[in-house]
Amino acid sequence: MYAIVEIAGQQFKVSKDLKVYVHRLANEEGSKVSFDKVLLLDDNGNVTLGAPAIEGASVEAKVLQHLKGDKVIVFKKKRRKGYKKRNGHRQYLTQIVIEGITAAGGTKKAAAKKAVVAEEAAATEEVEAAPKAKKAAPKAKKEATKE
């Protein structure tokens, strides 16, 4: 079983007991966190796709540690001008471990949504099938008389 979940603005494919580095979360080390924005859920071939998220589905995780990523060097240079600029950046990260994926009501909600969409489509067909107002007869064309 795996899920595609949005964590801190990024999408991750996660499964149980997977360790993931995400952008810094405000939670303390050792605390549990739940992510409700599950975009896709695969339960042994049974795929549930959210529009945009699956209602009732969640991913539970535990915060392991807060750390900084490797330094990324930003180097700018203009040739023949003597311009060189060197900057560095270290991203603040949080390491989490996925403890479980909950799909409570995910498939039921999706089936209910499909039924509602089908009912709406049937209602629009009934409206379209209603008799339309008669249009005015087209104007008669004047015949060219030859003299």
Curated annotation (Swiss-Prot):
The answer on whether this UniProt entry bears the keyword Ribonucleoprotein reads yes
What Pfam family is a match for this entry?
A: Ribosomal_L21p
Q: In its keyword annotation, does this UniProt entry include Transmembrane?
A: no
- The portions of this protein that span the membrane are none
Question: MF terms per GO, please?
Answer: rRNA binding; structural constituent of ribosome
Q: Which GO terms describe its cellular component?
A: cytoplasm; ribonucleoprotein complex; ribosome
Could you state one GO biological process linked to this protein? Answer: translation
Record keywords, A-Z: Ribonucleoprotein, Ribosomal protein, RNA-binding, rRNA-binding
**Residue span of region Disordered:** 125-147
Database matches in InterPro entries: bL21-like, bL21-like_sf, Ribosomal_bL21, Ribosomal_bL21_CS
The organism's place on the tree of life at top rank: Bacteria
Q: Which family does it belong to?
A: Belongs to the bacterial ribosomal protein bL21 family.
Subunit composition? Part of the 50S ribosomal subunit. Contacts protein L20.
Q: Briefly, what is this protein's role? A: This protein binds to 23S rRNA in the presence of protein L20.
Q: Which PANTHER family match?
A: 50S RIBOSOMAL PROTEIN L21, LARGE RIBOSOMAL SUBUNIT PROTEIN BL21M
The name this protein goes by in its record: Large ribosomal subunit protein bL21
Question: Taxonomically, what lineage is the organism?
Answer: Bacteria, Pseudomonadati, Bacteroidota, Flavobacteriia, Flavobacteriales
